[in-house]
Amino acid sequence: MVQVPYSRITTLKDITPDVSNSKYVVYWCIAFKRTKYNFALQRAVEWANKLSQPLIILEPLILDYPMSSLRFHKFMMDGMKEVSETIAKTNAYYFPFIETEPKQSDGLLMELSKQASVV
């Protein structure tokens, strides 16, 4: 696999991941909801491989997007199904979370990150 170009990487917290107290790498999928041509996902895969830890892909779908509609949510869920089918062929774990009430996913990333080496 080709490495992510350095110009595409932004380090927010420059620390060495503590693999002794962590269980996985988390990729928070909120913008580029695709498995190909996705530098962020590629970088998460690189980290998971480097640390020999499983990759969890978290993709939340919240109810209160500005300008959201039933059509928008149908489109998003169709995409989630495609991503799920693609990820099922890999060693990663795909965790789609679809809110049934507004704000239901608040704190979800924070909770998963407690046991993550890299987010």
Question: Residues of each region from the PLM?
Answer:
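Trp/Phe/Arg-rich N-terminal binding region typifying the photolyase-homology
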Residues: 1-118
